[in-house]
Amino acid sequence: MTLRCLEPSGNGADRTRSQWGTAGLPEEQSPEAARLAKALRELSQTGWYWGSMTVNEAKEKLKEAPEGTFLIRDSSHSDYLLTISVKTSAGPTNLRIEYQDGKFRLDSIICVKSKLKQFDSVVHLIDYYVQMCKDKRTGPEAPRNGTVHLYLTKPLYTSAPTLQHFCRLAINKCTGTIWGLPLPTRLKDYLEEYKFQV
């Protein structure tokens, strides 16, 4: 998955990529820059965003990983910001995430794009497809007609996430109603910062 810039190739991608770390106050940012900065903050909390990494480095990291293991990295393509690298039955491959009109979706051929679900954040997109893969995958299935099935099942972490983050993931997997839990408001606020299961 690769995050596609709204700008044409060349300096546009570099300019937009630099907005991920925009230094200004939120009121100084354009709504687009604020959305991208928020998306990166959320993505950086995951532990599976690897930042700058080449295609070959991603392949090396995923080479011995089980099928369905994935990571997100900066794209080496000038028209995109992010790429998801995932291990398939045929080896590691890369997918693009497109960003348009404030929404993220998988990159695809034009005739399918309008049918693809769109998300407010990259993490929401990944969380959705991980959950979808859990629901659909019943076991190893031999590809037919040369087709390779692609599953997102397990993130490859840059380093072990904190125990707090693992606890937050466990709570998110058990309930969707954080504010109904008998917890202090400060802890509920922490849980609300990252509402995903992956």
Curated annotation (Swiss-Prot):
Covalent cross-link Glycyl lysine isopeptide (Lys-Gly) (interchain with G-Cter in ubiquitin), where: K173
Biological processes, Gene Ontology terms: cell surface receptor signaling pathway via JAK-STAT; growth hormone receptor signaling pathway; intracellular signal transduction; lactation; mammary gland alveolus development; negative regulation of growth hormone receptor signaling pathway; negative regulation of multicellular organism growth; negative regulation of receptor signaling pathway via JAK-STAT
Chain spans, region Disordered: 1-29
Location(s) in or outside the cell: Cytoplasm
Chain residue ranges for the region called Interaction with AREL1: 1-75
UniProt KW Ubl conjugation keyword: yes
Pathway: Protein modification; protein ubiquitination
Tissues expressing this chain: Expressed primarily in the testis, some expression in liver and lung.
Residue span(s) of domain SOCS box: 151-197
Phenotype of the disrupted gene, per the record: Mice deficient in Socs2 display gigantism: mice display considerable weight increase (30-40% more than normal) after 3 weeks of age. This is attributable to increase in visceral organ weight, carcass weight, long bone length and body length. In addition there is a thickening of the dermis due to excess collagen accumulation. Gigantism is caused by up-regulation of growth hormone receptor signaling pathway.
Pfam short name (any one): SH2
Free-text description of this protein's post-translational modifications in UniProt: Ubiquitinated; mediated by AREL1 and leading to its subsequent proteasomal degradation. Ubiquitination is dependent on phosphorylation at Ser-52, by PKC and is stimulated by LPS.
Keywords, alphabetical: Cytoplasm, Growth regulation, Isopeptide bond, Phosphoprotein, SH2 domain, Signal transduction inhibitor, Ubl conjugation, Ubl conjugation pathway
Keyword Membrane: no
Free-text note regarding domains: The SOCS box domain mediates the interaction with the Elongin BC complex, an adapter module in different E3 ubiquitin ligase complexes.
Description of how the protein assembles with itself and partners: Substrate-recognition component of the ECS(SOCS2) complex, composed of SOCS2, CUL5, ELOB, ELOC and RNF7/RBX2. Interacts with IGF1R. Interacts with DCUN1D1.
Functional note: Substrate-recognition component of a cullin-5-RING E3 ubiquitin-protein ligase complex (ECS complex, also named CRL5 complex), which mediates the ubiquitination and subsequent proteasomal degradation of target proteins, such as EPOR and GHR. Specifically recognizes and binds phosphorylated proteins via its SH2 domain, promoting their ubiquitination. The ECS(SOCS2) complex acts as a key regulator of growth hormone receptor (GHR) levels by mediating ubiquitination and degradation of GHR, following GHR phosphorylation by JAK2.
Protein name according to UniProt: Suppressor of cytokine signaling 2
Origin species: Mus musculus (Mouse)
Lineage: Eukaryota, Metazoa, Chordata, Craniata, Vertebrata
Designated gene of the protein: Socs2
